[in-house]
Structures are given as C-alpha cells and as structure tokens.
Amino acid sequence: WDAIRFEVDHRDEDGQFMLTGSAVPVEAKKIHHTGTGRYGWLTMRPMSLWESGDSTGEISLSDLFLTPDKIGALNKLTLPMLAFVVCRGGWPKALQKKTEKAALLQATEYYKAITNSDISRVDNVKRDAERAKRIMRSYARHQGSQASIATILADISTNEPEDVSDETIDAYLTALRKIFVIEDMPAWNPNLRSKTAVRTSNTRYYVDPSVGVAALGLGPNDLINDLNTFGLFFETMCVRDLRVYADALDGSVYHYRDKNGLECDAVVHLRNGSYGLIEIKLGGEKLIEDGAKTLTALSNIIDTSRMKAPAFCMVL
C-alpha cells in the first residue's frame, strides 16, 4: 500500500495499479498513509445474473432510465432455475463446478468459513462460532425487514447458554459487515407533498442470497416448497443485482417506508437526481398488480416541484 502510494506520487499518472482485498481487510494500523487523493475505493460484489450468464441482458438499468417506453423481452428463467441460482449465488468458483450439487456446496463452505474463522480473524477478537451461526440464521429470517438488534437478540436468546447484550449482537453484525457478508440498505427520504414521517431504519440484506440460504440449511427444493421464504431470498438476489448495476451508473440503492405503511422495496438513485422506483415480486398476477399500485401511490405523493418525477416504475 505505502510502496504503491510512493510510486503513484513519483510517476504522477492515473490508473496504474489495481489492488484487490481478501475476505478479511488489512488492519488499518499497518497502513502509514490513508491514500487520500491517490486511491479510489470500489466495492467488489458477487456476480449478477448477467455476469454469471443466467440473464440475457436484454434490458439494462441504463435503458430503463433513458428509454423506459422502449423496453421488451421475455425472461426464460423458470421457477426451479431461479431457486437454483438463488442457492448457488454469484460466486465465480461455483460456475466452474461440474455438477449442480458441487456448485451449491460453494456457498455452504463459505458460510462455514465465515462462522468458524473469518468472523474472528477480521479484528482478532475471538467469537463463538455457534453464536455466529444463530445470529446469521436470525438475520436470514429477517432479511428484507427493518428488524432491530433487539429483535435479533430475542430471536436467538432461547438457544443462548448465557445472557447476551445488544452490544454483543452489534459487534457480531459489525464484523459481518467488515467482511462483506451483510450490507444493510439505507432509507430514501424524498420531498413529499405532505408532511409524512419517513422511517429511517436500514433494511437487512445479505450481500448474496446464497449465504442466507446456507445459514438456514435450505436448498432449491425447500424454496420451491415454501414460496414465502423463496420470495425473501429472491428479493435479496434482486437487490444484489440492482446494486451491481447501480454501481456501474454511479448510483445507489435505497428503500422507502413511511408511517402510513407505504413501502417501496428499492429506489435506484443516480447522482444526477434521476431515480427509479422498484417493487420486487417473485410472481403471481395479484402480487404484481399490488406492486404496481404501491408504486403509483408513492409516485403520487412525491413533490415534483422540488425534485424530479421518477424516471420509471418497475415491478421486478
């Protein structure tokens, strides 16, 4: 790090080096210079369905912003195929496996490594592997919600041999964030026509749905037999892909929820002020129509005299 920083100053040119990190980030105290003005930070995420070859890529996020009225394509992914890609995840190594069974093991082994070693290695604090598993299982059950630390604590406390504090749960979650296992989604706070209290709690998500599936010990058939659970993991996969595509457009992904219960799963907001509203539904005509009604309701309360109207509304 420091040697490259010196070389960057010496050459005085852009785009010379690319540094990639491991699952456990380097200790900050070992770095003598922050790199401000020399380094740009880029979050590397698991592969999207387009990158893993499971999506045709016929509809791009940029097209939705630029020409939403000229969108048309047919999705060929069946329910069993979706269940498989949710459980397999976006891990490059999983694509190299010769069988589906071997591909599914990749996320399971990653989950074991997280709980047995990575969660302790991140800051050299010994953490209990079984407690880490309980917290990750609870987090998986609450993904897509604004579950508080107190909720997660109540969820795991019956299986805890001793009293656990909120601070302990928070420390485990912080460690999981540092090693890029979970990534909460911040709240979106638009200009509204009326004074409505907007909820500001983050929404819980795994960086990749396969880790949550592995935490609960589920497989593709389990998801197909429980569409409610499948829907939660499908949402996490969609959020993963939206984040990948939004990053490429220099955008961010948020969620919206107000005191009246009006909720929007994802808002992709670009730096130029353009944004799209997205409801995520696994399928079913009624659920899709419900999603469309929600998007229309949210669009109608946005004060377009103080901010842009949505570039698009999409049921994903």
Regions found by a protein language model. Name each.
Residues 274-276, 312:
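Structural motif
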Residues 1-3:
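Conserved AAA+/SF3 P-loop NTPase catalytic/coupling segment centered on the Walker-B
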Residues 21-24, 28-145:
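Interdomain motor-coupling "hinge/lid" segment immediately C-terminal to the ATP-binding subdomain
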Residues 5-14, 301-303:
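Substrate-engagement module of ASCE P-loop NTPases
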Residues 9-31, 176:
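Sensor-1/coupling segment of RecA-like P-loop NTPase cores
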Residues 39-43, 253-255, 313-315:
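Conserved beta-strand scaffold positions in the cores of enzyme catalytic domains, especially
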Residues 282-316:
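Catalytic cores of nucleic-acid endonucleases
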